[in-house]
Amino acid sequence: SPYNSTNQDILISQGLISKIAENIEADKETEVYTFENLYVSCGWFDSGVSFGEPGFEERETLSNGLEVAARSGFTKILLNSNTDPIPDSKSIIGHLIKMSRGLTTTLYPIGALTVESKGNQMASLYDMISGGAIAFGDFKRPIQKANLLKIALQYCQSFEGMVISHPINNELAGKGVMHEGITSTRIGLKGIPSMAESVQIARDLEILKYSGGKLHIPNISTEAGLDLIRKAKKQGLKVS
């Protein structure tokens, strides 16, 4: 922005910014608010939001969650596929979008990659895209079947869809509850080795290199995992 690191006045008319300048002369009908050390930015985007509705409304309703997002500066959010029912069809995706209409923050649903997020049968991705989904993934569940990931990446290229793959190898992670190391041994808790993440990421990136497409890997927690993604980006792979 040309206004970066500068002090400016901002004129807002009917909810929209109409002018930015160092000194704006306000007429008598204009309400003036003065703030010290106030920072202004473009609206933010959250790529992984969980609301309670539908299915867990006692935690938080969708309208309340979107209002909180708007008041926090988020103009767009990506809704995780952990509702009940799981959003694995066009009708459920459409229902989520319909519920969010008229609110300040725009909601983009993540559709489940597999039916009921069970990891077996690929869901109707094209139907969900036409219903308003923009990405597909089984919330916090890795894609254990390598061929399923390959097919999903290939199929999504026909409509610019993105696949989300949670970076954990369940067999290596086992029933671990924390990082495997001296501390986990000392306090007697089952640990998860770092390679449970890096092995899964390496596999997913090899499949992406073969299949093409767009892949998003969330919740990276290891240096090795970050290094693998950096190298893949340098090779031109569409991974985030």
Regions found by a protein language model. Give the residues of each.
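Divalent metal-coordination and catalytic microenvironments
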Residues: 15, 37, 48, 69, ...
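Active-site metal-binding motif and surrounding structural segment of the metallo-beta-lactamase
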Residues: 24-40
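Metal-associated gating/positioning segment near the N- to mid-region
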Residues: 36-100
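Active-site mouth loops of central-metabolism enzymes
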Residues: 47-60, 81, 105-121, 140, ...
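Active-site loop-to-helix "anion-binding N-cap" substructures in soluble metabolic enzymes
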Residues: 54, 81-104, 111-134, 144-145, ...
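Histidine/acidic residue-rich metal-binding segments in metalloenzymes
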Residues: 122-240
